[in-house]
Amino acid sequence: MSGDKLLSELGYKLGRTIGEGSYSKVKVATSKKYKGTVAIKVVDRRRAPPDFVNKFLPRELSILRGVRHPHIVHVFEFIEVCNGKLYIVMEAAATDLLQAVQRNGRIPGVQARDLFAQIAGAVRYLHDHHLVHRDLKCENVLLSPDERRVKLTDFGFGRQAHGYPDLSTTYCGSAAYASPEVLLGIPYDPKKYDVWSMGVVLYVMVTGCMPFDDSDIAGLPRRQKRGVLYPEGLELSERCKALIAELLQFSPSARPSAGQVARNCWLRAGDSG
């Protein structure tokens, strides 16, 4: 039986493709069982290289089966088909953070603070459970229809991590969100990598643009070392700028932990942004 026919018998009606990777695509679908719209990630293991099938995919599935957090995407079920395809049925989202910024521009201070507090809480949960994401970026932060609630998604580069000396060597994620040590090919603490990426996400949220020009990747660490600049005339609280500076410290050891980020004074209610 084909995968699409099996999905139909299970009460799913596949719709348009809303995302596509090298070995997978994400489709929107309606579900009789869950009485509404879901997202289904379709992974074609036959087209994928052994490294993906034997290492990265099992890690992703292990994380998705084990995590339970209000700001991490929830998976309803996994459907394996004998033709090599795997269907991951999960929560659907109205949009993502990148689309919201592209559509509306920078996110106002209070809303940005509230959204980032949710992101920080989700990353702290992962790190407390010895898990890392390693691909935090605006596209992987899903938003509710009112753009007030977030869900982290896409754990394709996720793995277990128990901190130093449990270092990573795999280049993961997008260059624009990659920390200096990752770009330089140095064995890195993946938790500190996540923290750096959080800094890039926060900068994009509050400015509407990227902190560093990534058109020349070889020169990117040099620009990162100089620190960030802000668009002229941008109104942004000193507490927010201070947090971004902490997250984007060139030295990994100088960056805060995810727990420290979640407790940062800017994230306390009352700071207007």
Swiss-Prot record:
Residues forming the catalytic site: D135
GO molecular function annotations of the record: ATP binding; magnesium ion binding; protein serine kinase activity; protein serine/threonine kinase activity; protein-containing complex binding
Chief location category: cytoplasm
Gene3D superfamilies cross-referenced by the UniProt entry: Transferase(Phosphotransferase) domain 1 (1.10.510.10)
Tissues/organs with expression: Highly expressed in testis. Expressed at lower levels in colon, small intestine, ovary, prostate, thymus, spleen and peripheral blood leukocytes.
Key words of the record: ATP-binding, Cell projection, Cilium, Cytoplasm, Cytoskeleton, Developmental protein, Differentiation, Flagellum, Kinase, Magnesium, Metal-binding, Nucleotide-binding, Nucleus, Phosphoprotein, Serine/threonine-protein kinase, Spermatogenesis, Transferase, Ubl conjugation
Residues that bind ATP: I18, G19, E20, G21, S22, Y23, S24, K25, V26, K41
Protein purpose: Serine/threonine-protein kinase component of the sperm flagellar doublet microtubules. May act as a regulator of sperm motility by mediating phosphorylation of sperm doublet microtubule proteins. Plays a role in DNA condensation during postmeiotic chromatin remodeling and histone-to-protamine transition during spermatogenesis.
Protein name per its UniProtKB record: Testis-specific serine/threonine-protein kinase 6
Gene field: TSSK6
